[in-house]
From Swiss-Prot:
Annotated ranges, domain F-box: 1-46
Name the UniProt record assigns to this protein: F-box protein At3g18320
SUPFAM superfamilies (alphabetical): F-box domain, Galactose oxidase, central domain
Lineage of the organism: Eukaryota, Viridiplantae, Streptophyta, Embryophyta, Tracheophyta
Domain of life: Eukaryota
SMART domains from the UniProt entry: FBOX (SM00256)
Pfam families linked: F-box, FBA_1
Source species of the chain: Arabidopsis thaliana
Amino acid sequence: MTLPELPKDLVEEILCFVPATSLKRLRSTCKGWNRLFKDDKRFARKHIEKAAKQFQPLTLTKNYRICPINVNLHGTTPSLEVKNEWIELGDRYNEDKDSEIYEFSSDSWRVIDDIIKPPHYMEYFRKCLSLKGNTYWLGIDRRRRPPDLRITLIKFDFGTEKFGYVPLPPPCQVHGFEASRLSAVGDEKLSLLLVGDSTSNTELWVTSKIGEANVVSWSKVLSLYPKPNVGFWHGLSFLLDEEKKVLLCCKSKGWMKEEDEDNVYIVGEDTKFILLNFGVQTIGGYSPIIVNYVPSLGQIELAGSKRKRDY
């Protein structure tokens, strides 16, 4: 007796809840599933909406290696694995004051006309962050002078092609605290690392879900005192596990050296940390970056080519 086949619509509905990395392994099962996962934009959009999100921390080292980080907080030693031997990236400074948007469909840059740009200096070591169709920066108002400098959170909305501001949590307005780094919690919230002076805590703040309300609110989720001996200033990027109250930091051991070591620090609520080392990096002047990669069935269509790039 053969089992009856499930209706196609029901099969697709079930597959919509399967993580993207698991679906990739199913592509070789049959030609129909291969076409569904690879070429069906309708299914890809439906899968993005319904499937549970997978977050894989990745680091880009100073030697341009991409390394996934597996973190187990239950006794197993964390590990690093090199997945890509070499990536070529541009490293020149662009002093052009125009604002431009790169469009994949035309493989070209487009200058945004009639845009009011904020009078802020975006420091290169305070890296930008993209979330929910917006890009965010921490900037310093050029019109202020020490000791009246204040960090501001700036956003650019790709839908309206306008700059705007996001209010920062109260400690940012108090002497002794400064917004040091910006990151994301999953794909819904911003997180902010506030570094205090020698007598203050180091704090982690998280926003409400971006896009659910017109006004963004902040809540403090982690306070570290005494400060762990990690070095929260130059060259640091981080991810926060809001539920487990764990901070994952990536930075160079030194700063602006020709030979240096890239390290990952796993910091807990008790300020104790685990150190993972990438080894010696030979390219100076760059900082390692840590990001959350979310596998999906979405594809980027490149201009002038039938090839698609998975992400």
